[in-house]
Swiss-Prot record:
Name this polypeptide is given: Zinc finger protein 16
Pfam families (alphabetical): zf-C2H2 (PF00096)
GO cellular component: nucleolus; nucleoplasm; nucleus
Function as written in the Swiss-Prot or TrEMBL entry: Acts as a transcriptional activator. Promotes cell proliferation by facilitating the cell cycle phase transition from the S to G2/M phase. Involved in both the hemin- and phorbol myristate acetate (PMA)-induced erythroid and megakaryocytic differentiation, respectively. Also plays a role as an inhibitor of cell apoptosis.
Record-listed N6-acetyllysine modification sites: 487
Chief location category: nucleus
An example Gene Ontology biological process: positive regulation of erythrocyte differentiation
Compositional bias ranges of the Basic and acidic residues kind: 1-10
Family stated for the protein in its record: Belongs to the krueppel C2H2-type zinc-finger protein family.
Oligomeric and partner information: Interacts with INCA1; the interaction inhibits INCA1 activity and induces the cell cycle process.
Residues covered by region (Disordered): 1-43
Length: 682
């Protein structure tokens, strides 16, 4: 008589067998949680049970209306009537050998047909409470439902062959317990090969289970199997809503929740709703300043238990796994194995698409999604999908408002640890990214990448409308507004709209009178940084804009454009009163005051009025006696810059004003005008 096991023992034995577990995590949980009991009728039935539910599944007599199993003393009073018209075991096996799933329930046929008649060993029949759809992985169902004839199994004890492994197992259990299983290990003998396999798969403290891919250790076989699925990328659980497949049932459940439109958890403070209770709890902690989770080591408090656990790892001093190359220590052997590949340069995981190699299999899996476009991690709040779970977690903080990373210096919180690291360099002044061409250092790698484009001339951001290329994506976005005509930034004071936020900020200085940009040479202030840059060229003498016709240089591009109109004779600005044209709009504005008689600029000293501010400035020098413009050749000083320029032509010999009639040249425009009168008299 083979030894009988409770359902708990059977489950633990199944879980310990090496290789993929045929039970899903949900089924395993129900087995572990079930109390182990033996019904009083086990002597009659021959099978110990965990519950009445299992008793119904195992004992066929229990299922029949004429089976009295519920007497006061709970004894089994088995009826002896047996249906005489039952098919024989051979006929039933022949009818259902092709597909085990088609075998009817025991109670549907006869209350006296035993488990052994169906080729299922006593004590190994799956309880009814566990035979739910979804309790087995597709791989396990494939083993149970394999086609007849794929593999015939021999029984060593009899001249019998079986097409289904459960029938073979039943046959092998018929020999007596004096006949131990030929496999022996550690001095223990087993009647069933599955018992021996289960015994071999039980990990001990001396021999934990190790993942061959990453070196990570596990104390339980189900954990190892789950880890191996991560490396293989096997996806066995399919979502009925969208058809996506997942490697873990827990991830599938999360997927189901993302399809649910209901948001059951609503914040009473701000009204924001959440589908998941964990997201809701995290969000609520931000309304309260309470920090109930305190570190016993340093006393630091946190609003969330998960943040405390992460922090506590920083106090863990034990790192038993040390690198022989650099001495760096790790808490896990798997981390040491991955670290050692830095020294060896080993990259065993190669992408079959592009040949790129990686040190970690997880990095290869993430990289492969760049080729497939797969984004399996979806946000339950907004539906946005991501290729990596870490990116999803970072994104979800946008909805929850969680900022778990806090600066120790100023207390500023951040949602991402990378942002905290970048911010911390503000306090330390660290600039670890140095340009190999000019030596300039930067605090962020992205700033270095953008800077290097100055040396390479690279302009990777191209406008799809006009084809113009730019070094920075931000400049491209600003440029594209030219094509759309969009002006989203509007002044709240006067309603004027701008295409760029920077232009709006500069404009608002007109209303506030704010001039934040000061010249460190003379102290003059400006409302725009661009105006300050132009002004500073007065002190430096820089004139980067050169006329291609005469070689004259200018400090501003607008001044060059105006100058070029002297050569081409273009005068686009015409007075609507008298028709006189000008090459500058400012000259037209000044001229129009001749018609209006307007003189808005008044001297505070003598009260004289002027139509132009420049004329007033020049006039005021009469009262002050100031002569700020000095000739570098002879030292002579002048009150006006234009007079200095005319004077310098004495030293240079330049005569830019030519007479169109006779070709004579003059150093001053006024002298040319006087000369032209000679020709007009003629």
């Amino acid at each position: 008589m083979p030894s009988l096991r409770t359902r708990r023992e059977e489950a633990e034995m199944e879980l310990s067998v090496p290789g993929p577990s045929p039970w899903t995590p949900a089924a395993q949980a129900r087995v572990r949680d079930a109390p182990a009991v033996t019904h009083p009728g086990s002597a009659a039935c021959g099978t110990p049970c965990c519950s009445d539910t299992e008793l119904e599944a195992i004992c066929p007599h229990y299922q029949q209306p004429d089976c009295d199993t519920r007497t006061e003393d709970k004894e089994f009073l088995h009826k002896e009537d047996i249906h005489e018209d039952l098919e024989s075991q051979a006929e039933i096996s022949e009818n259902y050998a092709g597909d085990v799933s088609q075998v009817p329930e025991l109670g549907d046929l006869c209350d006296d047909v035993s488990e052994r008649d169906w080729g299922v060993p006593e004590g190994r029949r799956l309880p009814q409470s566990l035979s739910q759809e979804g309790d087995f992985t597709p791989a396990a169902m494939g083993l149970l439902r394999g086609p007849l004839g794929e593999k015939d199994l021999d029984c060593n004890g009899f001249d019998s062959r079986f097409s289904l492994s459960p029938n073979l197992m039943a046959c092998q259990e018929i020999p007596t317990e004096e006949r131990p299983h030929p496999y022996d290990m550690g001095g223990q003998s087993f009647q069933h090969s599955v018992d021996l396999t289960g015994h071999e798969g039980v990990p001990t403290a001396e021999s934990p289970l190790i993942c061959n891919e990453c070196g990570k250790t596990f104390q339980g076989n189900p954990d190892l199997i789950q880890r191996q699925i991560v490396h293989t990328g096997e996806a066995s659980f399919m979502c009925d809503d969208c058809g996506k497949t997942f490697s873990q049932n827990s991830v599938l459940k999360n997927r189901h929740r993302s399809h649910m439109s209901e948001k059951a958890y609503q914040c009473s403070e701000c009204g924001k709703a959440f589908r998941g209770h964990s997201d809701f709890s995290r969000h609520q902690s931000h309304h309260s300043s309470e920090r109930p989770y305190m570190c016993n080591e340093c006393g630091k408090a946190f609003s969330q238990n998960s943040s405390l656990k992460k922090h506590q790892k920083s106090h863990m001093s034990e790192k038993p796994y040390e690198c022989n190359e650099c001495g760096k220590a790790f808490r896990r052997s798997s981390n040491l194995i991955q670290h050692q590949r830095i020294h060896s340069g080993e990259k065993p995981y190669v992408c079959s698409e592009c040949g790129k190699a990686f040190r970690r299999s997880s990095n290869l899996i993430k990289h492969h999604r760049t080729h497939t476009g797969e984004k399996p991690f979806e946000c339950g709040e907004c539906g946005k999908a991501f290729s990596q779970s870490a990116h999803l977690r970072k994104h979800q903080r946008v909805h929850t408002g969680e900022k778990p990373y806090e600066c120790n210096d100023c207390g500023k919180p951040f949602s991402r640890v990378s942002n905290l690291i970048k911010h911390h360099r503000v306090h330390t002044g660290e600039k670890p990214y140095k340009c190999s061409d000019c030596g300039k250092a930067f605090s962020q790698s992205s700033s270095l990448i953008q800077h290097r484009r100055i040396h390479t001339g690279e302009k990777p951001h191209v406008c799809n409308v006009c084809g113009k290329a730019f070094s920075y994506s931000s400049v491209l976005r600003k440029h594209q507004i030219i094509h759309t005509g969009e002006k989203p930034y509007r002044c709240s004071v006067c309603g004027k709209a701008f295409s760029h936020s920077s232009a709006l900020i500069q404009h608002q200085g007109v209303h506030t009178g704010d001039k934040p940009y000061a010249c460190h040479e003379c102290g003059k202030t400006f409302g725009r940084s661009s105006n300050l840059i132009l002004h500073q060229r007065v002190h430096t003498g820089e004139k980067p804009y050169e006329c291609t016709e005469c070689g004259k240089t200018f400090s501003q591009s607008s001044t060059l454009i105006q100058h070029q109109r002297i050569h081409n004779g273009l005068k686009p600005h015409e007075c609507n009163q008298c028709g006189k044209a000008f090459n500058r709009s400012s000259n037209l504005i000044h001229h129009q005051k001749v018609h209006t008689g307007e003189k808005p600029y008044t001297c505070v000293e003598c009260g004289k009025g002027f139509s132009q501010s420049s004329h007033l400035i020049q006039h005021q020098i009469i009262h002050t006696g100031e002569r700020p413009y000095k000739c570098s050749e002879c030292g002579k000083a002048f009150s006006q810059r234009s007079v200095l320029i005319q004077h310098q032509r004495i030293h240079t010999g330049v005569k830019p004003y030519d007479c169109a009639a006779c070709g004579k040249a003059f150093s001053q425009r006024s002298k040319l005008i006087k000369h032209q009168l000679i020709h007009t008299r003629e």
